[in-house]
Amino acid sequence: MRISRRQFVSWGLAGAAVLGTEGIGGAFYGHVMRTSSRMDEPIPSVCRACPAGCGIVGYLRNKTRLTAIMGNPEHPTSRGRICALGMAAMNLQLHPERLWQARGKDGATLETPQALAEAGGRIARLVAGGARVVIDTWDEQQAHADFMAALGAPATLIGREALEYAAREKGMEKVWGTEVRPDLDRADLLLIFEDQPLDSGSRFMPEAQRIIDAKVDRGMKLVVFDPRLSTTGSKADVWLPIRPGTARPAALALLRHALEHVNLSQPVSMRGQYVPLVILAETIGAYTFEYAAQVCGVDVALFAEAGRLLVESYRPATMAGLPVFEREDAAAAYAAIALIDLVLGPLQIPVMPRPRQVPTDQAASPVAAETIYREIEAGQGKDIVLISHRANPVFERGDALRKALTSGGVAYHLALGPLPNETTDVADLVLPETTPLEVHGRVWLTSFVPTPTYVEQRPVAPPPKGVLRTQDVFGALAKHQANGDTAAPVYDLQMVRDLTGANTFFSVGTGIFACDAGYDPKLRYDVSLRFFRELPPFELHEPEVLRPVLLLHDGPVTNRTSAQAKWLAEIQHDARLFLHPDDARRLRVHPGDLVRCEAVDGAPGAAVEVRVFVSDGIRPGCVSLPVEQGHLVAGRLAMAKRFSTAHDPDMKMIWWEDEGPGVNLEPLLRREIDEETDVVKRPLTRLRIRKV
C-alpha cells in the first residue's frame, strides 16, 4: 500500500488531535512546561491588575512556585481571554525589588511584628486624640471595613477603583437613571465617541473581545469619533478625527440625518412626555453635516459615510468615553449621544452600581477625596492618619503632595504594598504586603452577566516568607484599636440584595457565584426637549494652531501604582509626544527631537520634556501623551537602570536604559471640582511647545 504525503499529514494531524484531548475532564487542565513533563496545579482566580476583573488560572508547581498565568475559560465575562498586563502580574510577584521587611522613614528595617505593633499603637493614640483615618486603596476589601469598625471613630475610605470612572457613571445616571453599556451581542453598528475600548478601560477585555467577535462573526460596523487614531480607531470602518469636546454637534448631526429616513409621526418619551419625532427633527434642524463638519473640523464626506452606515443599520448603539463627561459641554454632549439610542434603539443595558465593601457614608465621593488631598497639600491635614494601600497618590498628584508628606503634612502616614513607589518613599512606615495574586477576596461582575455575579479571588501563589496577607495586616492593626474585636457586616452582599431583591447565590462555575435576581431597572430618558431648544450655539475657542490641545491616553501595559514589570517595560518603556506632521513643520521639530511642554494655564515653571513622534494618526492642533508613565523613584526597573544580575538574570538584557522611563504628566494637568454632579473633571489643557 502506497501512502501519499497528503494521507500521511492528515493521519498525523488526526492522531495529534486525539492525543491533545486525552485527560481533559473540564475547563482546566494541568499546564505542561515546555522544558518539563511535570504537571502544575491549576488554581482559578480573578485578575486585579485593572477594574475589569478578568478570570485567570494560576499554575502552581509543588505548592510553592507560580509558573504561569492564563485566562479562565469558565469566567462569564472574559471567557478565557487575558491581556499582557494580566499575564505579567506573575512578574510582579517575583519582582527583584519586592519589599520583604518593614521600613521606617529613615530607611531602617524593622521586623514585621514590631512594625505592626508600633503602627497599631500609634494609630490608636492619634484616633483617641481626635485624628481621622483615611484609607486610600485601589483594592477595596472586607479587611478595610473590619479595621474601620474597630477604630471606634469616623473613618473614610478612598476606593480608587470605584472613583476612576465616576464622571461617566454620574453622567449616565443623570440621563438614564443608571449607568448603561451598549448591547454588543445584538448591535450591528457601534458609534464610539472619544473612547478606546480596544485599548483600555474599566471593562477592557470583555468589551474588546465582544467588539472584535461582533465584527468578525456578524459584520458589525464601527464608527469612531476620536481626535487620535488609537487601536480602536484603526479597526473602525469610519474614523472621524473630531476636535476634542465636539461630540454634541457630531451626534446631533447624525441623528438629524437619520430622522430624514424614519416615520416622523412616531413619538419618543423625553422626561416622561411623548414628543413626536417631527418636533424633535425641527429642534435639531440646524445640525447639518456641513455645520458639524465645520465645528468638528473634519471632511463632510466622512459625516456622509457615517450617516449612510447609521441609516442602513437596524440595531445601532453608542458608546461614550470618559473625555465626553469631563468637558465643559459634558451634559449636553452625552444627552445628544443618548438621544441616538432613544430614537433608534435603545440597545443599552443597565449596569448595576459596583458593590462596595464599606457603607456609603464611609466611602469618599470624588469631590471628598479631592478635598482631602487639597487639605493635605495646603498644610491643613495635621489631624489625618493616612493609610495608602496599593495606591500611589504621590505619583498621581505630584510634587505638591510629595512635599506635604515629606514635611509632616499629616499626623501619620502608613504605606502598605508589595513594591516600592513614590508614595512609599515618603511614608513614616512602610509595611510589606502581599500582591493580589496571594490573597483571598471577592470581585463583583456587574456587566455582561444576566445577574450580579461574584468571583472568588483565590491565592494562586503563597506569599514570601515573612510577608503577611492583607487580611492579616489590617487584622493586626485592628487589635490595637478601641473596638479591636469588632467585625463589620458583609456590606457588599447586602447591597446586592437590596438592589436586586436576591435571596440566594448559586454556583455557576469554579469559584463563581450568581444571585437569583437580576438588576433590570426600566431605563427612562430624563432629558427634556426644552433642554435641547435652550442649548446655546456651539462655540469654538481660540484657533488650535496657537496652542495645541493635550490628549491623554491609557497604556494597557503600564501600572501607575508601582514599578513596571520587566516584560511590560520591554513592550512600552518610553513616552512619546504624538504630533501631526503639519504641527511638526510649524514648530520646526522632527521625529526624536526633545521638546519642552508647558501648560498655558499651569503653574509657573511647570513643564515636562519629551521626545517627538510625528504621525498622521492624530488631528492637527492636538498632541497626545500616555498618562501612566514616568515613575520618579519606583525602583531601578521603572527608572530603566541596570542592577546586579544576581537578583534577576534578565536585568542584563535591559536595552532601553538610554531612552528613559517616560514622563510624569502631573505638572501639566488640572483638576476641577464639579459640585453639581459631585465629580472631579480634568479639563482640556493647552500647551506651549518649544524645541529644547
Task: Name each region found by the language model.
Residues R458-D516, W567-L577, D582-V692:
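Long, contiguous, secondary-structure-rich segments that constitute the structural scaffold
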Residues A117-V134, V180-L189, T283, A304-A317, ...:
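Glycine-rich phosphate/diphosphate-binding loops that line cofactor/substrate pockets in enzymes
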Residues K63-R65, N72-P76, A88-A89, E140, ...:
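Short, glycine-/Ser/Thr-/acidic-enriched flexible segments
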Residues A131-T137, R160, Q266-Q273, V295, ...:
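Short coil/turn segments at secondary-structure boundaries
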Residues S265-Y287, D485-R497:
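Internal, active-site/partner-interface "lid" segment
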Residues E194, K235-A236, Y287-F289, M319-L322, ...:
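Flexible glycine/proline-enriched surface loops and loop-helix/loop-strand junctions
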Residues A145-F225, T232, R248-A253, Q294, ...:
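Extended redox/cofactor-interaction regions of prokaryotic respiratory oxidoreductases
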Residues M1-H261, D299, V430, R585, ...:
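N-terminal export/assembly segments and adjacent metallocofactor-ligating motifs
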